[in-house]
């Protein structure tokens, strides 16, 4: 954490609506831009492992992202086939072949990434959307029409399938971003939002929706939890009966948990078969 940046960001955010044009021009905008540059390079992360098996959210970085909207004017963003009218530049604006090679990221036509997002080596961006402050680890694929929300954290060697979404923190304002740890598979049209954490090497099947209020039922133990999918889980959508027995409500079901050896030897499709047995 760069203490020389934290204090100015905290002070400016406390006066968000009363900042003067002069101080924005003289100090706040340059400071915010330095923070956004750090998010792009991976020097800063909105959320990071705490070395105790959990995650720590760096609130000052969220505030810097929000301040970016305050200290920048709406502008023309060049694009094809038509320009955009936005406050945030394209992540790869001005890139040439040399810069793309150095970044090691493959960006397919139709992919949109905003400034302030980080991409590790060997990331593949299909036509998708990645918002400001997001972190995408090395070797991860963001598939067609997938969304990585503002400040969302997506680990290394993950696959975010077509139409899937990882929720951000800015709209609506959330305390924590959604976090997908390393080596996870998120199935098509699934959504992980509201600061939910998916543990490493987990498989989320197609069409699974998990928020902080979603019941996560472990079929093996009968336990119900919220907001956290343990590592090596295989999760599908399901239902649990209401207490009065008149109806059922949606839930996510952990149908099995596999060890690392099994996960390495088994394809994703095989892991998702037979869960109705």
UniProtKB/Swiss-Prot annotation:
It comes from the Bacteria. Its EC number is 2.3.1.117. The gene is dapD. Homotrimer. Keywords: Acyltransferase, Amino-acid biosynthesis, Cytoplasm, Diaminopimelate biosynthesis, Lysine biosynthesis, Repeat, Transferase. One of its GO terms (molecular function) is nucleotidyltransferase activity. The keyword ATP-binding does not apply. Pathway: Amino-acid biosynthesis; L-lysine biosynthesis via DAP pathway; LL-2,6-diaminopimelate from (S)-tetrahydrodipicolinate (succinylase route): step 1/3. It is found in: Cytoplasm. Gene3D superfamilies: Hexapeptide repeat proteins (2.160.10.10), Tetrahydrodipicolinate-N-succinyltransferase, N-terminal domain (1.10.166.10). This is 2,3,4,5-tetrahydropyridine-2,6-dicarboxylate N-succinyltransferase. Belongs to the transferase hexapeptide repeat family. Pfam families: Hexapep_2 (PF14602), THDPS_N_2 (PF14805). It is an enzyme of class 2 (transferase). The keyword Amino-acid biosynthesis applies. The lineage of its organism: Bacteria, Pseudomonadati, Pseudomonadota, Gammaproteobacteria, Lysobacterales. InterPro entries: DapD_Trfase_Hexpep_rpt_fam, Hexapep, THP_succinylTrfase_dom1, THP_succinylTrfase_N_sf, Trimer_LpxA-like_sf. Substrate binds at residues 106, 143. It catalyses: (S)-2,3,4,5-tetrahydrodipicolinate + succinyl-CoA + H2O = (S)-2-succinylamino-6-oxoheptanedioate + CoA. One of its GO terms (cellular component) is cytoplasm. Its main location: cytoplasm. GO terms for biological process: diaminopimelate biosynthetic process; lysine biosynthetic process via diaminopimelate.
